[in-house]
Amino acid sequence: MAMFLKSRGVRSCRDRRLLSDEEEETSQSSSYTLGSQASQSIQEEDVSDTDESDYSDEDEEIDLEEEYPSDEDPSEGSDSDPSWHPSDSDESDYSESDEDEATPGSQASRSSRVSPSTQQSSGLTPTPSFSRPRTRAPPRPPAPAPVRGRASAPPRPPAPVQQSTKDKGPHRPTRPVLRGPAPRRPPPPSSPNTYNKHMMETTPPIKGNNNYNWPWL
């Protein structure tokens, strides 16, 4: 709160100073011209219309920047200033001798750029001292007459014989074929019934528990 009141007090002091400056300016202008009374009344109306409390140093800085937009001195000449002229020292650098030196080169370049149509019409070929005279190109040989019909194609060479790239090893003797007797036929699958029948047919009936009755044991 104290800071706010202090800032308001500073602003009121600035407003009083600005008002006193404006009053002095209006009084001076009234003493110089007769018609200053009307302008003074207009200025007083403008001052009363504007809010004096809103006017600050920032507005004053903006007004100064509008009058002088850049830091350059308006008295000095610039690139865009039409009233600026080069000084005597600048003019002395470029003399008439430079113009005389530039003219013969430009004339030589113009003479070398003469179009070929003008040279043919005049019939004369101006040859500058630094270039050789032009020599005519030799005439082109006549184009060969087109041959009608297809020319026979050369015969094709014989196809190369394909050689096997696989390396053959040493010659092995052929294996002799052994022809022996035919293999025996395997016995038919045995079953307990047939086996028992076979055994019963070939062996005599067992009578008593004797050792000869069990020869397979």
Swiss-Prot record:
Q: Whom does it interact with, and what assembly results?
A: Forms a complex with the host H3/H4 dimer and histone chaperone ASF1. Also forms a complex with host H2A/H2B dimer. Interacts (via C-terminus) with BGLF2; this interaction is important for infectious virion production.
> Where do Low complexity bias regions lie?
106-132
Where does the record place Polar residues bias? 32-42, 208-217
**Where is the region Interaction with host histone dimer H2A/H2B?**
64-68, 81-86, 90-94
Report the locations given in the UniProt record.
Virion tegument; Host nucleus; Host cytoplasm, Host perinuclear region
- Looking at the record, which segments are called Interaction with host histone dimer H3/H4? 63-64
**Name of the protein in question:** Tegument protein BKRF4
Give the protein's biological function: Overcomes the host DNA damage response (DDR) triggered by double-stranded DNA breaks by binding to host histones H2A/H2B, H3/H4 and to cellular chromatin. Can associate with the partially unfolded nucleosomes, promoting the nucleosome disassembly. Interferes with histone ubiquitination and recruitment of repair proteins.
Task: Note what the entry says on domains.
Answer: Binds directly to histones through its N-terminus.
What GO CC annotations are associated with the protein?
host cell nucleus; host cell perinuclear region of cytoplasm; viral tegument
Compositional bias ranges of the Acidic residues kind:
43-79, 89-102
The lineage is: Viruses, Duplodnaviria, Heunggongvirae, Peploviricota, Herviviricetes
From the UniProt entry, list the residue stretches annotated as the region Disordered. Answer: 1-217
Composition bias, Pro residues: 136-145
Task: For this UniProt record, give its keywords in alphabetical order, as a comma-separated list.
Answer: Chaperone, Host cytoplasm, Host nucleus, Virion, Virion tegument
